Amino acid sequence: MTTIVSVRRGRQVALGGDGQVTLGAVVAKASARKVRRLYHDKVLAGFAGGTADAFTLFERFEAKLEKHQGHLLRSAVELAKDWRTDRILRRLEAMLVVADHEATLIITGAGDVIEPEQGLAAIGSGGAYAQAAARALLENTNLGPAETVAKALTIAGDICIYTNQVHVIEQLD
C-alpha cells in the first residue's frame, strides 16, 4: 500500500505520496512515483493500490480529461461510471485522488466520486494518519499546502509500515 494526501488552501493545492512498493512482506521499490501531473499540468493525480491497475486508471482518467476539456468533476464521474460498469475495470484494485484549482476528489473502485470536506483528502494504508496530521497542521499553522503535505507524509511514514520517507509532492499555485 501507500499514502497519498492532498491539501488545499484557497486556490493552491498540493498532492503528495510516498514511494514504497511492497510485494507481500518485501519492499520491492522505495522510489516509485505515485503522483503525476495530468492535462497540460493543470490536474494533479495520485494513486494507492495496485501499480499496474493505477496506471490503467491514470490513462483512462487522462483520456476523460482530454475528452471533457479538463473538467475535473465530469471526467471523474465518467471514469467512475466506466469503472463501475466495465467487467475488466471492476477488477482493478486502486483508488485515485485528483485535484485542480477548483476541487479535490477521491475516486474509488466502487464507482464513488467523493469531494472531501476542508480541502483535505488522503488514501492508502497511511491515509488516516496523514489526514489527521494534515488537519491538525491546517488548523494550527500557516504552512502552505506543499509543506503541510510533506509533514503529513513524514508523520504517516513514521507510523505506517507500508509508507516510507521518499516523497513526491506536486503543487498547483
UniProtKB/Swiss-Prot annotation:
Record: residues binding Na(+): G157, C160, T163
Cellular component GO terms, alphabetical: HslUV protease complex; proteasome core complex
Description of activity control: Allosterically activated by HslU binding.
Hydrolase as UniProt keyword: yes
Main location: cytoplasm
Pfam families (UniProt xref): Proteasome
Residues annotated as catalytic: T2
Highest taxon above the source species: Bacteria
GO-annotated molecular function: metal ion binding; threonine-type endopeptidase activity
Compartment annotation: Cytoplasm
Keywords: Allosteric enzyme, Cytoplasm, Hydrolase, Metal-binding, Protease, Sodium, Threonine protease
Reactions that this protein is recorded to catalyse: ATP-dependent cleavage of peptide bonds with broad specificity
Protein's GO biological process: proteolysis involved in protein catabolic process
UniProt enzyme class: hydrolase
EC number: 3.4.25.2
Similarity section: Belongs to the peptidase T1B family. HslV subfamily.
Role noted for this protein: Protease subunit of a proteasome-like degradation complex believed to be a general protein degrading machinery.
HAMAP family for the chain: HslV (MF_00248)
NCBIfam families membership: ATP_dep_HslV, PRK05456.1
Record note on quaternary structure: A double ring-shaped homohexamer of HslV is capped on each side by a ring-shaped HslU homohexamer. The assembly of the HslU/HslV complex is dependent on binding of ATP.
Protein name: ATP-dependent protease subunit HslV
UniProt organism field: Nitrosomonas eutropha (strain DSM 101675 / C91 / Nm57)
Organism phylogeny: Bacteria, Pseudomonadati, Pseudomonadota, Betaproteobacteria, Nitrosomonadales
